[in-house]
Amino acid sequence: ISFSEIVIYELPENGELPNPNENSLLIDLVETHTTTYLDVEYEYYIIKINQGGSENSPNFSDKVRVSYEGVLMDDTLFDSSSIPVDFDLTSTIAGWGRVLPEYNNAENFVVNIDGTVTYNNPGIGIMFLPSGLGYFSAAAGSVPVYSNLIFKFKLYQSEFNDHDFDNVPSHLEDINEDFDLTNDDTDDDSFSNFVDSDDDND
């Protein structure tokens, strides 16, 4: 399935769904989730087009390999990559670290004779993010301030991050389990646990 095949339309004025055998109402597909970020509670929404065939899914602080398409609420495209690209989820907007762990990685992959890679049964979805889980009051490229965002994406692979190379995956250094690695400092030395290889001063 390609991103161009995932299309969101406004219902006609009569409220009737065109071609119901081919289309679905968003209300029947959307999952509502809540999270707290910077002391504010947010609702965000996801659609699971395909869960993904692997038994593994990323953690909020992992490296991920994805393709994606980001649009504003008026369907203006502001960012995309049709080929797989790698991200550290700690360096993306907060919404990605909440949403991608809800999906599984691709079941497997094949390296083709031309050197390209085909991923089979990846996680495929759509996320609807409030501005507070996006760029909020900061304009980013063509994204205006306080913009709600929509991303279509495919999740191919993920890998544990260990930012301080202490053999403890970074997601396990989130002691208070709030999806924020920067506010966990076990030994009070002003270095967050995930970048402090001796966070217990032993």
Language model segments and positions:
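Extracellular calcium-associated, cysteine-rich motifs in secreted modular proteins
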Residues: 158-202
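A beta-strand/beta-hairpin structural motif
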Residues: 48-51, 72-151, 165
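Acidic/polar, low-complexity intrinsically disordered N-terminal segments immediately downstream
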Residues: 1-47
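Short, glycine/small-residue-enriched coil/turn segments at secondary-structure junctions
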Residues: 36-40, 45-65
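A short beta-strand signature
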Residues: 62-74
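Short beta-strand segments enriched for Tyr within beta-sheet-rich domains
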Residues: 64-66, 125, 149, 201
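Short consensus segments that form the blades of beta-propeller domains
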Residues: 55-61, 140-145, 182-185
